[in-house]
């Protein structure tokens, strides 16, 4: 089913805010984009869950996802760049969206440190609550990640 221009505009705006809020460390603002019970899963190209040490990139609430990335990005600067979304309305209150993303992350110091560039696709479900739309689930399928010491 086709997505209404109004619903598409709301979701596109909120996804742009997702990137801006993450890149500018405005973690307290994600509750305006995501349901409290939103789920998050990040995959490698081979389908395995991304890990860092013993931590799996899988969260069952917005609060847990925010807590992880708020801490993770304290010493990092990021920029997320999205392509246009593919959207389909699954039910009157549910829209599926897929976004291409390229992201850069690096330590905040001007010299030395590390820099990484990655890309992939966000697969998301958005739910209508009243007259607004909120992210219910996010699955990131990473296609590329390159980390360099600088």
Swiss-Prot record:
Disulfide bonds: none
GO molecular function terms noted in the UniProt entry: lyase activity
Highest taxon, organism lineage: Eukaryota
Entry's EC annotation: 4.2.1.-
Keyword terms of this UniProt record: Lyase
Organism from which the protein derives: Gibberella zeae (strain ATCC MYA-4620 / CBS 123657 / FGSC 9075 / NRRL 31084 / PH-1) (Wheat head blight fungus)
Protein name as annotated: Probable cyclase FGR4
Group of enzyme by EC: lyase
SUPFAM superfamilies in UniProt: NTF2-like (SSF54427)
Pathway the protein contributes to: Secondary metabolite biosynthesis
Function: Probable cyclase; part of the gene cluster that mediates the biosynthesis of the tetraketides fugralins such as linear fugralin A and cyclic fugralin B, volatile compounds that play a role in the asexual reproductive cycle but are not involved in pathogenicity.
